[in-house]
Amino acid sequence: LGTVPTTIVPAVAGMASAQGDAELMESLSVVPAGMLVNAIFLSVWIFLPSRLEGLPLNRSLALTAMSALVVWAVVGTVAVLAIGSAQDGGASPESIAAAGIAMTGAFGLILGWSPGEAPSGSESVGASVLLARGGMAATAIGASVWVAGLGYPLVAGLASVFPAIFLTSMVALWVSQGPSVPRGAAAPMLLGGGSVGVYAIVAMTAIGDYGMAMGSVVAWAVAVVGWSLPSYAFLNWRSRAVGSND
């Protein structure tokens, strides 16, 4: 539930003020694919650390974080190019967004079906981490609005979902709790993050029908009820099922 749509709300409002309606639809169409890119980013935190166990923890953390960011940049670039090609071929923003949501959901269900060990942390998150998280999220929002104003709606859509909160969460959990906690948290975050894509596809219609403020509320409510809560129920069910078989 910690992955309900948050930073995407002001990002969409900012992008709407910086570009026209058609360009906003293009930006929103990238958001679900961007969350798939974020899911791949998080999967690096699941699979790579176990292959770096012979290294000191700080070096392992640095390599994991850098690798995840490189993967995000490469896959994000491929996604933007693919979406641009699909648009040139006549695909609608809505169909592109729906495809992104479907792929994110499938990826999340696969990794969530057999959840790994997710030990609870014993340390609270410090104020400096919260400040860093907020600062990076604000930077991502500002960057998306700026890029939208430059006339690059697809890049703006990807920038709006830069995994600032995911990155700071993974690093903070690793530093304070050890590598096993972020590994266990990544899969639930991966599936839950799909709610941002649902927000985007609903916002395509809701903002036009109800205006920015009420349309955002409608999109947020649909995303939480239609994605976040079912994802939470699914992950709880799989966790209990796997636990009962151990």
Predicted segment positions?
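Cytoplasmic-side transmembrane-helix entry/capping segments in multi-pass membrane proteins
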Residues: G2-P5, E53-V70, S95-I101, S122-M136, ...
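Small-residue-rich transmembrane alpha-helices that serve as helix-helix interface/gating elements
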Residues: A99-A106, P163-I165, M214-L229
